[in-house]
């Protein structure tokens, strides 16, 4: 059913769908159910836990660990092999549990259509499950109901539908049954009602033209299900890291093999030694620590109102270079609020407060007097069909958003709305074609009339001496500021007769009262959050279905843009898109605000930014945001949004505050920082082991540490301390850095320098002490090895403090900020001394007791590692200061 139903008249629609006003017969319904199927959306195939579990093994670093594990078992290092297997399984379980809870898009989409529908079948009104609807069914809508399928409206009475979840527009749309032109965008199709949208007021009759996946929401559902998940920066970096690590290990193995070959070692012995060295150089604990780091940051995010559904999204948010935000409900409250009142004599009043509540006051400008708006405020309460009440410690509202805003205005003026509604004798409901609504009410002995609506319509009722041009200028000025404006007028009826229906000719000559300006206010935290995003190197753009003037007004208030040239519309985007992707991408780079945008265009914008090399996070709360949320590098849903958005997004902002996104960025960057810190520690220690290993072989010394002792360092010392580093809090300047390039290798210049320099210093230190113990002091190899093992433990203990920051001094971060690190070092030292002093354990570790004075000397020998690290950091900070930028 791909016809443009909004362009077809009622008679032809009945003909095309082979239906009638009396509705379909039961026989016709059964035939069509077989033809079109149930009115349900396509479901994504849900993965079992086992499937999710095995997917965790599709990771390059896991491949290396699996190979290492197999080699460990081949050469008889069963403990090492078992440990690596344990690490792989733990990592897989942790990842599986997190992933299994996420990504249930189809179920959430289906929730939108689990509603009953009132239909006419066999010339009778009946209620049926919406899933049983078929094209051609006649559906009846009333206030408070949800639209059960895509409908072409054929009759309407005062119908207003909230389509914000589909179009992004904050203002409910007034509907009619009139034919429209082909150029109408989705939000302008006033003779259509779409699945999942809500009827705010009025009644209507419509014909089902599309069901299930053929509806507008169905199209979005298909886009969501067909869009592949994007790869996060951490995944990209780990893939590169794995390749680099594999290459380095291969080069290392080749070097050692060459040395051993020329020294006359047997082939079997060379194989065992090379494999053992390769095993010691692989950071077996890294996958678990990465998962743990992301989990810790995920928990921190939850405490800061960011719920993480997909673990990789934790770090991904910290890499964002663009945040494409929905306007309605994300940057604004989606609660129309009266902000200004302007009287014909130019008296102006500012109204404070935001949203649907009684918080705020009415402030007169200059010589304006508060009592002069008394009549206008009361008219807004008489001529009102919404409700706003304070129930169980919260404000509850229903009805048209602008009517609700007028009730809020009444509360700020200390007036209760219910008493006014009781005096209403009759109404003329708002119709978009008429452009006004009217209420007849009793006030004392008089019967008065209150009329509100578009300016020109209200002025046509007014005959009193009014400077209409002056009022038009007032209205124009308010519209340019992005306000939505209602005009008010009042009059008295001399002869009033109560009847069922009132018409325009029942309205007497009126007196113009003034203009009321409404705005969907920005969220209090949004402006500062956007400013902070800018400092963090993140550009914020707005994508909305609203009018360009409204969008520009909000963007200007948020300081997103200052020039109208930065705004574009859906029609303009369509023209540029058709001219080719290159032109489209260039065009997108120049824009900050995108208005009147369709869901598919949102997706096109996201894809354009990705082609431009940006790493884009998309926020949203409606169904219309789902394709973009899914396609984005990071999808961020609002907690009060639709289930569709929340299930599609990788993150959910539980308090709906834009500032919480900034919290997420901070924690995301912290998570990646911690991954780098752990990598720095593990690899620098691994390099040190390789250095003293190669030096010993090359210079004909016994190896300073046995395979068991190397394993002890890898499993216990590294294994405990690297976990503690995962708990590091974010550094003070983390939100003043530019986002890292998603394509940047984990092994960037800084990390390479740190790992190689510190690893080299540690390795040479250990080898120097080894020579001194053997050649100068004449220690037995086993005794010397005990000293070297303790020296390595001390070096790794102190190096943990170096790893707390790649740039800042260890003295700039209070130790108390990471209590886990202190505990881990204490535990490592305690275990080390217990093992040395216990005869059974020391035998397993091939270790001997060490005199206290030797312990002191070894500790002092490990201190220079801090000095070297501090010098390296000093030069890095100096480089940053000179470049005025982060590496």
Question: What is each stretch, according to the model?
Answer:
Residues 803:
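A C-terminal functional module that forms or caps the active site or interfaces directly
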Residues 754-769, 830:
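Alpha-helical transmembrane segments of multi-pass integral membrane proteins
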């Amino acid at each position: 059913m791909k016809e443009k139903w909004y362009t077809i008249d009622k008679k032809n629609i009945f003909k095309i769908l082979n239906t009638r006003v009396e509705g379909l017969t039961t026989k016709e319904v059964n035939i069509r159910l077989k033809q079109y199927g149930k009115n349900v959306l396509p479901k994504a195939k849900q993965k079992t836990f086992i499937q999710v579990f095995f997917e965790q093994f599709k990771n390059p670093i896991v491949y290396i660990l699996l190979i290492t594990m197999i080699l460990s078992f081949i050469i008889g290092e069963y403990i090492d092999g078992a440990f690596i297997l344990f690490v792989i399984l733990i990592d897989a379980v942790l990842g599986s549990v997190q992933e299994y809870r996420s990504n249930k898009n189809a179920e959430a989409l289906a929730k939108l259509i689990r509603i009953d529908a009132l239909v006419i079948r066999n010339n009778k009104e009946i209620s049926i499950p919406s899933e049983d609807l078929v094209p051609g069914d006649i559906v009846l809508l009333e206030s408070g109901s949800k639209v059960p399928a895509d409908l072409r409206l054929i009759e309407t009475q005062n119908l207003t539908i909230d389509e914000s979840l589909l179009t992004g527009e904050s203002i409910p749309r007034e509907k009619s049954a009139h034919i429209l032109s082909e150029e109408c965008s989705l939000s302008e199709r006033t003779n259509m009602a779409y699945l999942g949208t809500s009827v705010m007021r009025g009644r209507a009759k419509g014909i089902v033209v599309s069901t299930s996946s053929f509806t507008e929401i169905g199209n979005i559902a298909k886009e969501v299900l067909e869009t592949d998940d994007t790869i996060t920066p951490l995944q990209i970096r780990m893939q590169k890291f794995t390749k680099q690590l594999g290459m380095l290990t291969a080069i290392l193995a080749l070097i050692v093999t060459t040395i051993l070959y020329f020294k006359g070692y047997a082939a079997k012995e060379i194989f065992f030694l090379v494999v053992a060295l390769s095993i010691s150089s692989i950071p077996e604990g890294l996958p678990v620590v990465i998962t743990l780091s992301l989990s810790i940051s995920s928990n921190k995010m939850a405490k800061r109102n960011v719920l993480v559904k997909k673990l990789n999204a934790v770090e991904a948010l910290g890499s964002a270079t663009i945040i494409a935000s929905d306007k309605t409900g994300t940057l604004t409250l989606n609660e129309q609020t009266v902000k200004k009142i302007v009287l014909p004599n130019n008296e102006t009043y500012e109204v404070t407060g935001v949203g649907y509540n009684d918080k705020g006051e009415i402030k007169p400008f200059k010589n304006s007097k508060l009592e002069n708006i008394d009549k206008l405020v009361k008219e807004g309460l008489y001529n009102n069909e919404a409700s706003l009440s304070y129930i169980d410690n919260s404000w509850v509202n229903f009805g048209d958003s602008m009517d609700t805003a007028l009730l809020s205005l009444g509360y700020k003026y200390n007036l209760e709305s219910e008493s006014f509604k009781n005096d209403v004798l009759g109404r003329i409901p708002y119709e978009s074609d008429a452009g006004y609504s009217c209420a007849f009410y009793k006030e004392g002995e008089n019967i008065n009339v209150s009329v509100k609506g578009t300016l020109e319509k209200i002025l046509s009722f007014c005959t009193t001496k009014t400077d209409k041009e002056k009022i038009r200028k007032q209205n124009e000025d308010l519209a340019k500021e992005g306000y939505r404006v209602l005009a008010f007028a009042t009059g008295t009826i001399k002869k009033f007769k109560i009847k069922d229906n009132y018409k325009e000719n029942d309205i007497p000559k009126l007196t113009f009262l003034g203009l009321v300006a409404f705005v969907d206010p920005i969220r209090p935290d949004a402006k500062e959050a956007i400013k902070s995003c800018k400092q963090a190197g993140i550009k914020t753009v707005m994508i909305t279905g609203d009018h360009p003037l409204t969008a520009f007004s909000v963007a200007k208030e948020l300081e997103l843009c200052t020039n109208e040239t930065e705004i574009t519309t859906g029609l303009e985007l369509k023209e540029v898109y058709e001219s080719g992707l290159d032109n489209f991408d260039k065009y997108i780079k120049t824009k900050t605000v995108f208005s009147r945008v369709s869901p598919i265009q949102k997706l096109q914008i996201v894809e354009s930014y990705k082609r431009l090399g940006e790493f884009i996070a998309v926020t949203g709360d409606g169904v219309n945001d789902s394709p973009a949320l899914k396609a984005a590098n990071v999808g961020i849903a609002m907690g009060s949004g639709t289930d569709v958005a929340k299930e599609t997004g990788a993150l959910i902002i539980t308090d709906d505050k834009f500032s919480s996104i900034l919290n997420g960025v901070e924690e995301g960057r912290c998570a990646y920082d911690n991954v780098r810190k752990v990598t720095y520690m593990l690899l620098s220690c691994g390099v040190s082991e390789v250095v003293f290993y190669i030096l010993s072989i090359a210079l004909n010394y016994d190896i300073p540490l046995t395979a068991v002792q190397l394993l002890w360092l890898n499993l216990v010392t590294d294994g405990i301390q690297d976990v503690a580093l995962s708990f590091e809090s974010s550094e003070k300047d983390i939100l003043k850095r530019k986002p890292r390039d998603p394509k940047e290798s984990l092994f960037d210049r800084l990390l390479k320098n740190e790992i190689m320099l510190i690893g080299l210093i540690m390795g040479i230190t250990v080898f120097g002490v080894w020579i001194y113990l053997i050649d100068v002091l004449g220690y037995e190899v086993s005794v010397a090895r005990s000293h070297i093992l303790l020296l390595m433990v001390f070096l790794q203990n102190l190096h943990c403090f170096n790893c707390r920051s790649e740039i800042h001094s260890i003295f700039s971060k209070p130790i108390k900020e990471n209590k886990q690190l202190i505990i881990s070092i204490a535990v490592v030292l305690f275990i080390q001394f217990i093992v040395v002093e216990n005869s059974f354990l020391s035998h397993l570790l091939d270790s001997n007791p060490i005199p206290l004075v030797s312990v002191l000397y070894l500790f002092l020998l490990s201190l220079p590692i801090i000095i070297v690290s501090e010098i390296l950091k000093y030069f890095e900070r100096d480089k940053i200061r000179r470049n005025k930028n982060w590496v």
